[in-house]
């Protein structure tokens, strides 16, 4: 594939970019996975997380929300010895905290997908950046999502992390305009006009 988005640096990046990033997702398990992985990525490269993704799936019960919500302090201590994940206590504990928050979100909103997608009106925002460097780090929508997730007790859900989650799960199409994946994701997601970038 020619003219991929310029953030793609490795083969793992390329596979993720070509097959998953920006594709609209309404699957609660996948959305929970990306919520946890985007939080784990804070301060690290995304390539580091992609290289540990299989380890995360094994360590966190294939991202079954109810299973992770039942993790005990003993289970958390064992995870902190697992080289297959980022062994940061706050991040590991946040995965369990966030699973319990997602349970409450599902009870109140029917699904995690319904809750998350409500912040873009149920339809992906279609941007058309000439370069990925032009894309914002956060928007009014990610600010609102961050605030709402924090209200449920979620951790590692700042606005920048939330915007990365929105990009990853297709709530926002931030593929570069010249990237072949842009048109494919746009066709999958509909035609909502691009939102203006948040003022700095």
Q: What is each of the regions a protein language model found here?
A:
Residues 1-200:
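HhH-family (HhH-GPD) DNA N-glycosylase catalytic core used in base-excision repair
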């Amino acid at each position: 594939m020619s003219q991929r988005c310029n953030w793609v640096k490795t083969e793992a990046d390329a596979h993720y970019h070509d097959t998953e990033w920006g594709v609209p997702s309404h699957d609660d398990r996948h959305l929970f996975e990306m919520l946890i992985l985007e939080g784990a990525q804070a301060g690290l490269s995304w390539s580091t997380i992609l290289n540990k993704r299989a380890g995360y799936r094994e360590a966190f019960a294939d991202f079954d929300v109810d299973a992770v919500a039942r993790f005990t302090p003993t289970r958390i201590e064992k995870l902190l010895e697992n080289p297959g994940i980022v062994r940061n206590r706050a991040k590991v504990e946040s995965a369990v905290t966030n699973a319990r928050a997602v349970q409450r979100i599902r009870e109140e909103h029917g699904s995690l997908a319904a809750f998350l997608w409500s912040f873009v009106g149920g339809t992906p925002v279609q941007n058309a950046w000439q370069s990925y460097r032009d894309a914002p780090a956060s928007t009014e929508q990610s600010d609102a999502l961050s605030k709402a997730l924090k209200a449920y007790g979620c951790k590692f859900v700042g606005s920048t992390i939330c915007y990365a989650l929105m990009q990853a799960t297709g709530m926002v199409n931030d593929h570069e305009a010249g990237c072949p994946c842009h048109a494919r994701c746009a066709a999958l997601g509909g035609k909502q006009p691009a939102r203006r970038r948040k003022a700095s």
